[in-house]
Amino acid sequence: MKKRIAYISLYFFTVLLIFILQKPLFMLYNGSIEKGFGFADYMQVMIHGASLDAATAGYLTAFPFLLVLISIWFRKFPLKKILYGYYILAAALISIIFVVDMALYTFWGFKLDASVFLYIDSPKEALASVSVGFILLRVLAILLLIALNSWVLLKITPSVLTATRKRIAGTAGMLLLGGVLFIIIRGGVTESTSNIGQVYFSNEPFLNHSAVNPDFSLLSSMGKSQDFASEFNFFDEEKRAALFDGLYPTTDGDSIIQVLNTKRPNILIILMEGFGGAFVEPLGGLPDVTPHFNRLSKEGIFFTNCYANSFRTDRGTVCTFSGYLGLPTASVMKIPAKSRTLPAIAEGLSKAGYKTDFLYGGDINFTNMKSYLLSTGYQRLIANTDFSLAEQTSNAWGV
């Protein structure tokens, strides 16, 4: 039994180490020294990226784990022979994705995702901007990495697993180990699951991108590849233009109304969920539920015809801070390659010299929120982990 647990543990940590070692290579290839990043930055990238590396290593450990679990009920189980093909496939995927991601980042500026498949139909055009030597060197690197990774994985794998006398107890023990593996893959036991945003830690996009596991980035984006342009196209362009005409301020003359008594105010944005008009008396809602808000409605600008943009936190947040309408079947916040390109209030304020903080009482890794906030101008994030344990557990959804 110890031999089985030792093998699964060794396999998992070997794959994890492969992913961790990829990070400094990725950074060096993409000019980290020229960009002024030092040893501390390399360490930060590897430490913060380890959780997503562990989740991806967990996925790749799932199949060997199932074989080891089954082997308990066999007198002799030829583990290495069965896993030979799987190791070649796993090594090929790890190596190809790493080299392609490393090479394309120089041109794209973002991590490998499902958009790479858009170029498969026209490889000639995709390869037109690089030389034959460029391609051959990277193909050679892929082949060497496949051979090296396969050799390492085969080296740590026992050839045969023999039967254990206590099969029931052994099965129970392995199932417990499987539970640990599931938690690693999921990314913990909190509301958020493993996502790209959990490894973001810096205001430097390059460091955040370096921390992202390319295998996870590619696989997670494949389920989000949709042709949104062909969906929900209810109006022709002429009618759409007529409906939108007048919604935006004109560019002629001075259309700005001065409503503040200072040109550089402190700005506090409070975003509340479930705060519907049914609870606000000035909107025809119940009386005395929001007395202080009722008072504020008389002192400032009160919008009486304002509707929530979506029914989920991630979609409504992006709409509020970036002015990007929520999509019916997808969350832009969960697509970092898109969300990082959106305009945002915090980004504009940062450029104007403001310090931008974001306070959130819940798990800020939920639905990739962390990556969106750091990518759109927020300089400091305060979340549930900044509070005491008692405060963190005071409510299921945060402080």
Show the residue positions of the predicted features.
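Transmembrane and membrane-interface helices of multi-pass
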Residues: 2-227
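Soluble catalytic regions of membrane-associated enzymes that act on cell-envelope
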Residues: 190-399
